[in-house]
A protein has these predicted regions:
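Phosphate/pyrophosphate-binding catalytic cores of soluble transferases and nucleic-acid-acting enzymes
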Residues: 1-316
C-alpha cells in the first residue's frame, strides 16, 4: 500500500527528514523549542497525543509550544476512535509533503516506537483483517478478559507480546487475529528490507541516566496532577468516556478507569500507579529503540551537540 503521492517522491520530499525519539520524560519537547521554526516543523509520533481532549495526561505540547514551532498530527482523532499505524503513515506522509512544499524539514518526534519503524519501512505482509476472525477474537476477549488475551498472546507469539504493551488491546487483538487467521505469529511476518522511497533519515535517540530519568518521570507526573489531570478525567466522564475507548488505553488515563472499576479514586494511589507504569514503559521503549539501526544516541542535556548534528545533516 502506498501512502504518498507521486509529487512527494519526485520532489525529493524525503531527501532530508529527522527522527527524534526517546522514552517518556526524556526531554524531547524542550529540545524542539531550540530549533528554528522557519526551517523545521514537527510531526507528532505519540499514539495518545493524536487524540483530542487528551492533553494533560498525554503530556501534549502546550498551545504556546505549538505556536512557537508548527506541529502536525496533534488532535486529529476523537478518543473513542481507533488510530492505526497505517493512519499514522498516511497522515505523516501528507505532512511531510506540506512541510517540504514550505521549504522546511520535517522532524518526526515522539515515543511510540513502532510508528518510526513502520514509517521508515512500511507495513508487514501480515494478512488483512477478517471480520469473522475479528468477531471471534473479540468474543473471546469479552468472555475471558484483557489479562487472558495478553497471556494468550504471550503463548502463541511471545515476540509480539514483548513489543506490545499489555493495555494496548487494539494491537493485542490484532496480533491474536493474525494468529487465528494464519496459524502464524504476527512477528513472523517481516517488514520490507529497504526503507520506503529510499528514505535515509537522521535518527537521533535521546537517552539519560536511568536515575535521572526516573526522577524526571516523577516530577512530570506531579506536574500533571498540579495542572489539573483529575479535572481532565472528570471532563471526559461528562463526555460519556468509557474505559474501552482507544484513546484511554494510554498511561495517565487507564489508571483512573481501573481505579473506578474497583470503586476507588485515591489521588496518591493513582499517581503511584501512573509513575510505575511510566517507568516500565520507558524501559520497553528503550528496548525497542535500541533495535533501530544507525541511531545516534545523544544526551538531551548537550543541546549544542544535537543542534550541530542536525545542522550538519541538513547541509549534507
Amino acid at each position: 500500500v502506498k501512502y504518498i503521492s507521486k509529487s512527494l517522491t519526485s520532489s525529493g520530499a524525503f531527501s532530508h527528514i529527522i527522527f527524534l525519539f526517546g522514552p517518556t520524560g526524556v526531554g524531547k519537547t524542550e529540545l524542539l523549542l531550540d530549533l528554528d521554526p522557519q526551517r523545521f516543523s514537527v510531526i507528532n509520533a505519540d499514539s495518545i497525543q493524536v487524540y483530542r481532549h487528551l492533553d494533560i495526561g498525554s503530556a501534549k505540547a502546550s498551545k504556546e509550544v505549538q505556536n512557537t514551532i508548527t506541529h502536525y498530527l496533534i488532535d486529529v482523532q476523537d478518543p473513542w476512535e481507533q488510530f492505526s499505524v497505517g493512519d499514522f503513515i498516511s497522515y505523516a506522509d501528507k505532512a511531510c509533503e506540506k512541510i517540504h512544499q514550505e521549504g522546511k524539514i520535517p522532524i518526526i518526534s515522539g515515543g511510540t516506537a513502532y510508528y518510526f519503524k513502520h514509517f521508515l519501512y512500511g507495513l508487514s505482509e501480515a494478512p488483512p483483517s477478517d471480520e469473522a476472525v475479528r468477531a471471534q477474537v473479540s468474543a473471546l476477549i469479552e468472555l475471558h478478559g484483557n489479562e487472558w488475551a495478553f497471556r494468550r498472546l504471550s503463548e502463541v507469539d511471545p515476540v509480539s507480546a514483548e513489543r506490545i504493551h499489555p493495555s494496548d488491546m487494539y494491537r493485542v487483538s490484532r496480533a491474536l487475529e493474525v494468529y487465528e487467521a494464519s496459524g502464524k505469529p504476527l512477528s513472523s511476518f517481516s517488514l520490507p528490507a529497504e526503507p520506503r522511497y529510499g528514505m535515509h533519515p537522521l535518527v537521533i535517540g535521546l537517552a539519560r541516566d536511568s536515575a535521572l530519568l526516573r526522577s524526571r518521570i516523577g516530577l512530570r507526573i506531579k506536574k500533571m496532577f498540579d495542572e489539573g489531570l483529575e479535572d481532565e478525567i472528570r471532563g471526559l466522564l461528562r463526555m460519556g468516556a468509557e474505559s474501552s475507548w482507544p484513546g484511554l488505553q494510554g498511561i495517565g488515563y487507564k489508571e483512573f478507569f481501573q481505579a473506578m472499576e474497583h470503586g476507588e479514586w485515591s489521588r496518591s494511589i493513582i499517581a503511584d500507579q501512573i509513575e510505575r507504569n511510566s517507568r516500565f514503559y520507558a524501559k520497553r521503549q528503550m528496548t525497542f529503540f535500541k533495535s533501530f539501526s544507525e541511531v545516534k544516541w545523544m544526551d538531551p542535556a548537550d543541546k549544542q551537540a544535537i543542534l550541530t548534528e542536525i545542522a550538519q545533516y541538513c547541509c549534507s
